[in-house]
């Protein structure tokens, strides 16, 4: 059974704007799935359906077989699907890190002992031990992102949904966050669904990609399969990973002929070593 099933979903806002049209997606437990598309493609609307913030106008969204339209399912769905917003300041509103991470647990009515244990565990996972008494609002952008993530992890979700997780992070912060998310996925078997405009992190992290444009699903498949549809991506103002673009230039200049398009530094380095007999 798919962990997330999205079947024939449409969503129409009250003003008549159709944000999503006939969307179908299947996501299995433990997958890392990138949702790509230009601004206004429908990504945020889709994400808001995954834990029942909004319901489809037609079609269905199911999490572990539970329909998000059924009100009695929502407590379980919202426990199982953790949302991390694009702007951490939209998610952090308590006066201390401890209170921030404990907030959802208090609402779940877990015991004090369990609460303390989960807060400590979540901070350890995101490498923020010792920050319990600090104010979230005085932290750096990268630290805020980790605290927001910890507050969701403390709920022990089965799925993490991240809206533009690397936005506003510097290159070092981006790499650290990607490594952390990969560790969470691999060690805890948590499914991760994320949107991004940073094409360079997609081949480093995702194993499946869906591409939306104007509310419609226009591409889906493995990372290489999707990025090989270069014309489609460029027509909706999405770029290739920079390494892939460099490979295109080298090929068009007659410098190197690649058997398949490299997407990461590691892949292009391997191609060049194979062609040149090692460097």
Curated annotation (Swiss-Prot):
Family matches, as Gene3D superfamilies: P-loop containing nucleotide triphosphate hydrolases
InterPro entries, sorted: AAA+_ATPase, ABC_transporter-like_ATP-bd, ABC_transporter-like_CS, ABC_transpr_CbiO/EcfA_su, Co_trans_ATP-bd, ECF_ABC_transporter_ATP-bd, P-loop_NTPase
Limits of the ABC transporter domain: 4-239
Annotated ATP binding sites: 37-44
One annotated GO molecular function: ATPase-coupled transmembrane transporter activity
Enzyme class: translocase
Signal peptide: none
Keywords: ATP-binding, Cell membrane, Membrane, Nucleotide-binding, Translocase, Transport
GO BP, sorted A to Z: cobalt ion transport
PROSITE patterns assigned: ABC_TRANSPORTER_1, ABC_TRANSPORTER_2
Membrane topology reported for the UniProt record: Peripheral membrane protein
Family matches, as Pfam families: ABC_tran
Location(s) in or outside the cell: Cell membrane
EC number(s) recorded for this UniProt protein: 7.-.-.-
One Gene Ontology CC term in the entry: ATP-binding cassette (ABC) transporter complex
NCBIfam families: cbiO
Family designation: Belongs to the ABC transporter superfamily.
Protein's job: Probably part of an ABC transporter complex. Responsible for energy coupling to the transport system.
Name listed for the protein in its UniProt record: Putative ABC transporter ATP-binding protein CA_C1368
